A protein has these predicted regions:
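C-terminal regulatory/oligomerization modules of transcriptional regulators
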Residues: 1-10, 131-153
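Charged, amphipathic alpha-helical coiled-coil/dimerization segments
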Residues: 57, 61, 79-142
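Short amphipathic alpha-helical elements of helix-turn-helix/winged-helix folds
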Residues: 23, 27, 51-55, 140, ...
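The alpha-helix within a helix-turn-helix
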Residues: 64
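Short alpha-helical elements of helix-turn-helix
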Residues: 15-19, 39-50, 72
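N-terminal leader segment of winged-helix/HTH proteins
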Residues: 1-39
């Protein structure tokens, strides 16, 4: 017998925070990906530019650790950013085997464009929530994430 309402989620799932977070994350990821693609960018571009802008020049390995991107993906994304002159690579004066990556003025302008686009995406994602609930949700998600990413005791 076929379920007469195939889009209705079982109550056991709909009441699980893990299920709700996963489903929301899938939709959020799609919105971010589509939003950035509309301005010819990717999420890795934003993450790398934001990391460089906040922390300054860094090695590719440090960028990967700080932005949560695997080193092989860092290299590919940096190649794309360098082609557009949003970043420059130069040999590290203290270790010539390593490159130091620096954001350029064009990269900072691109970062501002991406921030504006991502603000629109956040508004779309969180449309049903008023500003105070958006802030509450962000605070609660940050707390849960911090709990699960802190080093073991």
């Amino acid at each position: 017998m076929e379920n007469p309402e195939p889009d209705v989620v079982p109550t056991r799932l709909a009441g699980l925070p893990s299920w709700l977070i996963t489903q929301t994350a899938v939709r959020a990821g799609r919105l971010v990906s589509d939003g950035l693609a509309a301005v010819d960018a990717r999420g890795y571009h934003f993450r790398l530019l934001a990391t460089l802008d906040e922390f300054g020049p860094a090695s590719q390995a440090a960028l990967g650790r700080r932005s949560g991107i695997h080193v092989s993906d860092v290299v590919a994304a940096l190649n794309e950013l360098a082609e557009r002159e949003f970043v420059v690579r130069a040999p590290d004066p203290s270790d010539r085997r390593r490159n130091v990556v620096t954001i350029t003025a064009a990269g900072r302008r691109q970062l501002r464009r991406l921030e504006k686009r991502l603000a629109e995406v956040q508004d779309d994602l969180l449309a049903p929530l008023p500003p105070d609930e958006r802030a509450d949700l962000t605070r609660l998600l940050a707390r849960v994430l911090a709990h699960h990413t802190r080093p073991p005791v």
